[in-house]
């Protein structure tokens, strides 16, 4: 599972997720991508479950890029603990994902296999998603 090697502070503020993602909105590495339509925290377990679902369906063919990383710790206090007495103990790691962020990319498999693999991965995630294709940017041509 994905966890940071080391962090400066074990406990973080929750923060808030307003607006859309600033970067990572397009398919950069693969041919197809899974884009978030809503914002949410995605845990390292959910990322791993989505990755396993994709790679199993693709029968270890093709390549998968995970473009999110769970760098934020979340805490919780024990059951029956009274208010106060400081912040709770770190329980796990989450990746804050804003809407329009491309979370996973796939390449090296046929279109129908890629779409089904990404659909299976989307079922494991707590956000609404859509499958997008790589947009070929019209660059300079060496014609004429």
Curated annotation (Swiss-Prot):
Domain of life (superkingdom): Bacteria
Entry's Gene Ontology molecular function annotations: rRNA binding; structural constituent of ribosome; tRNA binding
Sorted UniProt keywords: Ribonucleoprotein, Ribosomal protein, RNA-binding, rRNA-binding, tRNA-binding
One of the GO biological process terms: translation
One GO term describing the cellular component: cytosolic large ribosomal subunit
Range of residues in the leader sequence: none
Pfam families: Ribosomal_L16 (PF00252)
Matches recorded under InterPro entries: Ribosomal_uL16, Ribosomal_uL16_bact-type, Ribosomal_uL16_CS, Ribosomal_uL16_dom, Ribosomal_uL16_sf
Keyword rRNA-binding: yes
PANTHER family xrefs: 50S/60S RIBOSOMAL PROTEIN L16, LARGE RIBOSOMAL SUBUNIT PROTEIN UL16M
Assembly description: Part of the 50S ribosomal subunit.
Functional note: Binds 23S rRNA and is also seen to make contacts with the A and possibly P site tRNAs.
Stated family: Belongs to the universal ribosomal protein uL16 family.
Annotated protein name in UniProt: Large ribosomal subunit protein uL16
């Amino acid at each position: 599972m994905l966890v940071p090697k080391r962090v400066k502070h074990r406990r973080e503020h929750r923060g808030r997720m307003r607006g859309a993602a600033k970067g990572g909105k397009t398919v950069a590495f693969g041919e197809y991508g899974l884009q978030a339509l809503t914002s949410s925290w995605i845990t390292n377990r959910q990322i791993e479950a989505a990755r396993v679902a994709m790679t199993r369906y693709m029968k270890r063919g093709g390549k998968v890029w995970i473009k999110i990383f769970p760098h934020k710790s979340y805490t919780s206090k024990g059951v029956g603990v009274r208010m106060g007495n400081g912040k709770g103990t770190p329980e796990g790691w989450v990746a804050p994902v804003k809407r329009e962020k491309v979370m996973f990319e796939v390449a090296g498999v046929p279109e129908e296999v890629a779409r089904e693999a990404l659909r299976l991965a989307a079922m494991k995630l707590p956000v609404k998603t859509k499958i997008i294709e790589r947009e070929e940017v019209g660059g300079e041509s060496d014609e004429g």
